[in-house]
A protein has these predicted regions:
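An acidic/histidine-cluster motif and surrounding catalytic segment
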Residues: 1-85, 89-214
Length: 214
């Protein structure tokens, strides 16, 4: 696979330091990038909130909607896949030095490819790792080391245009509502459509560089 992709950054505008750190990281790179800021937790309207029920906080709703809008933008673009980052996950030297090697090994029919350990610090266990192997197929079943399914939080992941459109359409179905966060919902959709999911190990993006903003 080539590295012709765009980076979409889910960003909460009040956190200006995060944007600066992200821009400092990306400015010298060859990648185009875009800050997704359409949905602000401080002023979501009733239309924004209509897909959610229960006691989910507006911060999680805004985050969820931001990922969904990234899927929309990718599905309407000329790119075959994109990298989605949350604003606490700026790439560092390891990402730039290794991304080409990882993408060359990633199957072309991938659906999602998680490249950070996420806020839950999920890793492929040492007993499952193989020498020189960097890309691992992740089953959609819960595990003690990998959470409730195939997602790996939502801090840093590639997604293909095909499956971005599927997730976008699933969210926008007339009957759809949810009471959960984007990464938990991903697991439901991954299972429903048998989306091929892969994890990077070693990871390419370090997360948890800031206190949680949720």
């Amino acid at each position: 696979m080539n590295n012709n992709f765009k980076i979409y950054i889910v960003h909460y505008q009040a956190l200006k330091e995060r944007k600066k750190n992200m821009e400092d990281s990306l400015r010298e790179s060859e990648f185009s990038y875009y800050f997704e800021t359409k949905f602000d937790r401080r002023n979501l309207n009733e239309e924004d909130k209509k897909k959610f029920y229960g006691d989910l906080k507006d911060s999680y709703k805004a985050n969820f909607l931001s990922h969904i809008n990234c899927y929309k933008l990718l599905s309407e673009s000329s790119n075959n896949f994109a990298l989605i980052l949350e604003d606490d996950s700026p790439p560092d030297r390891s990402f730039y030095e290794n991304i080409d090697k990882y993408l060359r090994k990633l199957p072309s029919d991938f659906g999602m490819f998680f490249i950070s350990a996420g806020k839950n610090n999920f890793h492929i266990p040492i007993y499952l790792r193989k020498p020189f192997k960097r890309i691992y197929k992740k089953e959609d079943k819960p595990s003690t080391w990998g959470g409730a399914g195939a997602s790996r939080n939502a801090d840093a992941y590639f997604i293909s245009k095909k499956y971005a459109k599927i997730l976008y359409d699933e969210f926008n179905h007339n009957d759809f509502t949810t009471d959960t966060t984007i990464d938990w919902w991903m697991n439901d959709v991954i299972r429903k459509y048998d989306i091929p999911v892969y994890w990077a190990e070693p990871v390419l993006i370090e997360t948890n560089k800031f206190e949680s903003s949720f």
